[in-house]
Amino acid sequence: MAKGKRTFQPNNRRRARVHGFRLRMRTRAGRAIVANRRSKGRRALTA
């Protein structure tokens, strides 16, 4: 029985484009996410 391939293939550019700060600031909901993380005192706001 062969297992499937590993699903996490790290790629920094994709990580930034999908979860990055610029993307979060683009939408109202994204800005809310950053604001919540700021108020919570998260060390890293975005990827």
From Swiss-Prot:
Gene3D superfamilies: 1.10.287.3980. Disulfide bonds: none annotated. InterPro entries: Ribosomal_bL34, Ribosomal_bL34_CS. Keywords: Ribonucleoprotein, Ribosomal protein. One of its GO terms (cellular component) is ribonucleoprotein complex. GO terms for biological process: translation. The keyword Transmembrane does not apply. One of its GO terms (molecular function) is structural constituent of ribosome. NCBIfam families: rpmH_bact (TIGR01030). Belongs to the bacterial ribosomal protein bL34 family. This is Large ribosomal subunit protein bL34.
